[in-house]
Amino acid sequence: MRFTSVRGVKINFKIVGSKGPWVSLNPGGRREYKEAEPLAEYVAAKGYRVMLHDRRNVGASDISLSAKETEEAVWADDLYELLSQNDALPAFVGGSSSGARMSMLFGLRHPEATRGLLLMRVTGGA
């Protein structure tokens, strides 16, 4: 496990691959980044660096319930900061279900940092 502080919250993350454009993969629901590891390994083998992380309130990352915005908006801004800290911008950002919704918000909130979106199983949510 590797941790960093992102906007006052300890975030667990992993980088897969050592060269190429950056990609962030985000599982759905409240699943840990481990769910996306097989896909990350495949993408990295094709010449990309992949950022995986446990979003706040998920997996090994800290719990923080004080946000005044939707959780997916908070996650999008956390991801922006995490990618910034690792000189990983601009990036392709993608995910499934809640990870897809968070990715779309990332693109809307940080268009200059978004190379493209990879959206899988785009579903509803509260």
Positions of the model-derived regions?
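N-terminal cap/lid segment of alpha/beta-hydrolase-fold proteins
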Residues: M1-K10
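Conserved HGGG/HGGXW glycine-rich cap/lid loop of the alpha/beta-hydrolase fold
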Residues: V9-D62
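Active-site phosphate/pyrophosphate- and oxyanion-stabilizing loops and adjacent acidic/basic residues
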Residues: E37, Y80, M104
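Glycine-rich, phosphate-binding/catalytic loops in enzymes
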Residues: L39-V43, A67-T70, P111
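Active-site loop/oxyanion-hole signature of alpha/beta-hydrolase fold enzymes
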Residues: L52-G94
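Conserved hydrolase catalytic core segment
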Residues: L89-G125
